[in-house]
UniProtKB/Swiss-Prot annotation:
Belongs to the P-Pant transferase superfamily. AcpS family. The lineage of its organism: Bacteria, Bacillati, Bacillota, Bacilli, Bacillales. It comes from Brevibacillus brevis (strain 47 / JCM 6285 / NBRC 100599). SUPFAM superfamilies: 4'-phosphopantetheinyl transferase. GO terms for molecular function: holo-[acyl-carrier-protein] synthase activity; magnesium ion binding. This is Holo-[acyl-carrier-protein] synthase. It is found in: Cytoplasm. One of its GO terms (cellular component) is cytoplasm. Mg(2+) binds at D8, E58.
Length: 128
């Protein structure tokens, strides 16, 4: 059963500007492991990666029906590539408790795409 779907789009330049102005802003959006993915990447690629994860986390919050706020923060969600490079979203167990969901029964589908100017993400949250 599908619990919810979410889509978000973000301007990559907006994220690039934010990163340049406030480097610590990345720590607000990305977990430590997600930040590690940025090492060795060009500024352009870093902005794309941060924008894509920002959009995916916003989409995930929409799919869960909470938005970003009291129940769910950017750091409650983590998006890391699997062995094939596919983005996999995990959510902290405390969030599942707040939402009265069983984490062993929830599957999250994530798709992230970029153009030169935008990053877009779609998330589907499914309970099995």
């Amino acid at each position: 059963m599908i619990i919810g779907t979410g889509v978000d789009i973000v301007e990559i330049e907006r994220i690039a500007t934010l990163i340049k102005r406030q480097e610590r802003a990345i720590k607000h959006f990305l977990t430590t492991d997600e930040q590690q993915l940025l090492h060795g990447k060009s500024e352009t690629r870093q902005a794309e990666m941060v924008a894509g994860r920002f959009a995916a986390k916003e989409a995930g919050a929409k799919a869960l029906g909470t938005g970003i706020g009291a129940v769910l923060s950017f750091l409650d969600m983590e998006i890391l590539p699997n062995h094939l490079g596919k983005p996999v979203m995990t959510i902290k167990n405390e969030v599942y408790s707040k939402l009265d969901l069983d984490p062993t029964r929830v599957h999250i589908h994530v798709s992230i795409s970029h153009s030169q100017s935008h990053a877009i993400a779609q998330v589907i949250v499914e309970e099995r």
